[in-house]
Amino acid sequence: MSTFNFASMAAQLGQEQGISFENKVLSWNTAADVQDVVDALNKQTTVHYLNLDGNTLGVEAAKAIGEGLKRHPEFRKALWKNMFTGRLISEIPEALKHLGAALIVAGAKLTVLDLSDNALGPNGMRGLEELLRSPVCYSLQELLLCNCGLGPEGGSMLSRALIDLHANANKAGFPLQLRVFIGSRNRLEDAGATEMATAFQTLKTFEEIVLEQNSIYIEGVEALAESFKHNPHLRVLNMNDNTLKSEGAEKIAEALPFLPLLREMSFGDCLIKTNGAYHFGEALERGNERLEVIDLGFNEINSDGGLVLVNAMGNKPKLRILNLDGNSFGEEGSEKIISEMSKLPTAAALQPFQHQEEEDLEDEYQADKQDADYEEEEEVHEHANDTTEEADEDSEGDEDDEEDEGDEEYSNVAEETAYVTTNAYTTKLFNDTTNSMASETFAVANKTISQKCTPEKFCLSQKPCSQEDFDSLDMDNKLEALQSIVNQFTGDNHLLLLVFTTLKCAHLSQSSKAALDLAVSLYQATFDYAIKTKQETRVLNYVLMQLRLLPCKEVFHSDYDVKNCRFALREALKQPTFANDNIKNSFKTFLEGAES
């Protein structure tokens, strides 16, 4: 009695005691195989946890361990990761049923259930359903099911079990306080994610939700975003490597004001792109001051989107990590972002642009390659009006190479493209038409188009034409006639000719209704082609620079009426079928900025 001490008792009570066979790499098939585990359970008075991670458990062995667990009502942590390697699909649910039934008999009160890295699937979930609905889980705080291959069906089964658990716990007077759900790499897809969202919205108690790499698209993202609004205590939210796109980012951004305690948000590799960055930036600028970690890496965000995000960090005094690596900033854009971040007291939070360094090395290689290509191209230009066989052969060789490279994925417009129609470009176009047309259109480059304008002359002129020239296009279907010229070219030639034919019509848009209608149709055709060839960012930036809405690294003079071209673009944006929301919103943002 003299050694009786409340403090020591409290300390002892606070110390977890348990049994671990972690990473023993043992194969347990029979009761005899697990005798050491059973003996430990029988001998140890207090067992708060049992760690079986890294072994493989059969049905009979699970039944024997279950007999030992029945003796421990104080049991609270089932650390059962990676324990069914090499097992038959029929063994897993049976083994889980034995373990779960034992905990129910013992009257255990689980706080942690970790079954990560087990190939459960819907079949394995059948072995968990009874346990998850039982009083054993009324006290559950952490449910860890990473890399369990649940699929949509397994996700649906889990959701229903959690909703039933919530109802059962409330009815028994023990409200469920599940705080953590780790469900990455489960192939939930939209159907499974939507079902899980129903559970999240029902429970309303989550502080951490991790759903990395689950093949979730916009339908699932919308449902999840709505469910997050009902979990105001969320501190960690991780949906890396799902396909949010800008639409999904908008939905998540709408949920952020409902999450004032958020400390970590991770949406890397989610294809949110620049428009998605705008959505996040706008929301973050207004709140979420407690954020410490933000991961938006590898999202194809351009430097404008990166700057918007950095500007939203001004009210984040606790920021420790801001990961924007792997986006499409370019060297100059990266420098601007680093410069803007350096003005903040949390400047050290910005992670290095390691991926950008790799891209810079590739850019240097490509630049060297382009220099070599340019030298070869100059030889062609020297023979632009030469009709000799030698000149024709050289020209054809270069054109073949150009076509091969024309549709390659484009990465950094601001640094790698000249934003003007150069003589080299027009020479190339004219070499693809007849020699007589080529010489005629060269003459057009420095004077007004001839009295009667043809579709060829209209499209291939280096300068915009007059209203008189436009009116002299006397064919019934001007759009079809112009497109027939554009469609004779491929790759970048097709793209650039389409852009500048559009601008030629837009140039006259406020003086001619017919020109305006053509410009609207051609703007749409331009971005339909950009989407089809996966060049949205490239073409968007190119047109923005031609309209003086985006700074251009290379100074150039334009003969086009920018005001008229912008007017036609605004009319095109009103069309419900124009491009997509990302392109529409980007144009609207820049146009509004130009007006302010």
Curated annotation (Swiss-Prot):
GO terms under cellular component: cytoplasm; cytosol; nuclear membrane; nucleus; perinuclear region of cytoplasm
Phosphoserine PTM sites in chain numbering: S436
LRR repeats mapped onto the chain: 44-71, 107-134, 137-164, 203-230, 231-258, 259-286
Tissue expression per record: Both full-length and truncated protein are expressed in testis (at protein level). Expressed in oocytes and nurse cells (at protein level).
Domain of life: Eukaryota
Primary subcellular site in the record, as a coarse category: cytoplasm
Functional note: GTPase activator for the nuclear Ras-related regulatory protein Ran, converting it to the putatively inactive GDP-bound state. Trans-acting factor necessary for meiotic distortion. Distortion is only seen in individuals that carry the RanGAP tandem duplication and express a RanGAP truncated protein. Binding of truncated RanGAP product to the Responder(RSP) locus initiates events that lead to sperm dysfunction. During oogenesis, plays a role in the biogenesis of annulate lamellae containing nuclear pore complex components.
Protein name: Ran GTPase-activating protein
Species this chain originates from: Drosophila melanogaster
Lineage: Eukaryota, Metazoa, Ecdysozoa, Arthropoda, Hexapoda
